[in-house]
Amino acid sequence: MTRIQDDLFATVNAEWLENAEIPADKPRISAFDELVLKNEKNLAKDLADLSQNLPTDNPELLEAIKFYNKAGDWQAREKADFSAVKNELAKVETLNTFEDFKNNLTQLVFHSQAPLPFSFSVEPDMKDAIHYSLGFSGPGLILPDTTYYNDEHPRKKELLDFWAKNTSEILKTFDVENAEEIAKSALKFDALLVPSANTSEEWAKYAELYHPISTDSFVSKVKNLDLKSLIKDLVKTEPDKVIVYEDRFYESFDSLINEENWSLIKAWMLTKIARGATSFFNEDLRILGGAYGRFLSNVQEARSQEKHQLDLTESYFSQVIGLFYGKKYFGEAGKADVKRMVTAMIKVYQARLSKNEWLSQETAEKAIEKLDAITPFIGFPDKLPEIYSRLKTTSGSLYEDALKFDEILTARTFEKFSEDVDKTSWHMPAHMVNAYYSPDSNTIVFPAAILQAPFYSLEQSSSQNYGGIGTVIAHEISHAFDNNGAQFDKEGNLNKWWLDEDYEAFEEKQKEMIALFDGVETEAGPANGKLIVSENIADQGGITAALTAAKDEKDVDLKAFFSQWAKIWRMKASKEFQQMLLSMDFHAPAKLRANIPPTNLEEFYDTFDVKETDKMYRAPENRLKIW
């Protein structure tokens, strides 16, 4: 029998950990996943009902339902031939030479399913957040991240072997000749990319990935392709700069993307087209297409046809479904109460910043200014992005609709470049069980789906709600002041607003946070403190501020507060999935999230009478306080 004083996570969640079962089609179960399962069930019923009673007064939802019905028409899917896929494959197969590839870059971006072996993106400019910038990065890797390619990684060989076999089977389904050779060649190109790819640790420090280069310099360094013409075709103008997010890839560009490697690049593109098409046809192909992902995370079985139908519809109509969900399931009373909690949390933060002992008054005042400028969005957005009015289902096949949608979405990506950034837009649908802070707009967003038990309920006590959604709200506020967010000002621009000595003190705090988690063992391996530092700063800030707010309520119950905190992090997962998270997830493993932050809070020791001999004890001089 565990005790809270030795293991908060295991004690509070003992019954759940014993009884909870990981669904056969998922790699884990958690408080978040339980809500996802509930939402899936509700939405599947809702969309089935709407299929019988079409929402003709809501054109975007109507198109979503038409697509949903097409995704669920298994008779048509079983009969559908592969001519459209073969047509996509032919767009690459007919590129006989590297010269052919060079001459068709624009066509490939806008009118094919073939990904280029490099990527341009349109994102808010980190130093001018009201305008968009053109970003440049590599094409990504086949395995989850760079660490999987180390020869000592226990799963490297089996994953690459499985991917090759699975991919060649998919290629053969589409009558591609030399399928095994193509899969092997794709892996050879993938292996060439590894040294130049960003590590997960590098991606985690996103504020440090902003490397602007004048467009003239950017294009002149690349000799093998005419990127100047491509950029003009993409954004219909010549930007003054390109933001390079993967430096090593840019430096290695000509040694990777060249005539000598063309056969490997071509094979890589063919595998991407083939794998991407598997979701749109018969059941056997759908199962085959998901096999590698299931093997990677040790998932026992494929998603059911009904869940797949919903997944596919969400992949194109996420905000449409989210807005429907938010309006149906999220009430005004809940919205008002959560808004009250957000306001309370911001006030707590203001008070804590004004009393902060390690910041100068000047930096603390600027931090409070940034805090005051944070805009919260709760529940669901007021309107849909305009792009959804362009997605129209046709009389063609499911795959043909997807091709058309992809073309429209790609065109929209680059069309945005000449517009101002809409800082009120949501980057997460309302039915997603999550929340986020956006540094470029200085906004915090709480979708309707997370605003339910165990995170939040009007039936829960104030302490339970502060231990649940309160810590999530304060966590997102804390991201404005984590190692990345702290580098952005109140307008959302990457801008040094700290005094040097204050930022140096903050960097020391970051090092302490890294040390607090680094190497801590879990059942799947040790935690990487550098990878998870930003989320750990947010977790610590979140629980600290929410605790302060909970204590201001008349019905305060700190046992309930800490217990609820432990409940929201409950999780069980396959070992393979946990190992993948350890290598690439910016969040700490669930048990560490539940157990480590409370040990930095005096109230935890007082509430549960934690002694020096207890496993949860941390000496006062080692208790870390940041915000």
Swiss-Prot record:
Details of cofactor binding: Binds 1 zinc ion per subunit.
Known EC number: 3.4.24.-
Boundaries of every Peptidase M13 domain copy: 1-627
Localization per Swiss-Prot or TrEMBL: Cytoplasm
GO biological process: protein processing
Variation of activity with pH: Optimum pH is 6.0-6.5.
GO CC, any one term: cytoplasm
Family annotation (CDD domains): M13
Entry keyword Iron: no
Activity regulation description: Strongly inhibited by 1,10-phenanthroline and phosphoramidon but relatively insensitive to EDTA. Not significantly inhibited by p-chloromercuribenzoate nor by phenylmethylsulfonyl fluoride.
One example GO MF annotation: metal ion binding
Family annotation (InterPro entries): MetalloPept_cat_dom_sf, Peptidase_M13, Peptidase_M13_C, Peptidase_M13_dom_2, Peptidase_M13_N
Pfam families recorded: Peptidase_M13, Peptidase_M13_N
Residues at which Zn(2+) binds: H475, H479, E535
Active site: E476, D539
Keywords, comma-separated and alphabetical: Cytoplasm, Hydrolase, Metal-binding, Metalloprotease, Plasmid, Protease, Zinc
Key word Metal-binding present: yes
Cofactor(s) of this protein: Zn(2+)
Primary site of residence: cytoplasm
Thermal profile of function: Optimum temperature is 30-38 degrees Celsius.
Family the UniProt entry places it in: Belongs to the peptidase M13 family.
Job of this protein: Endopeptidase with broad substrate specificity for several oligopeptides.
Assembly and binders: Monomer.
Protein name listed in UniProt: Neutral endopeptidase
Organism: Lactococcus lactis subsp. cremoris (strain SK11)
Lineage: Bacteria, Bacillati, Bacillota, Bacilli, Lactobacillales
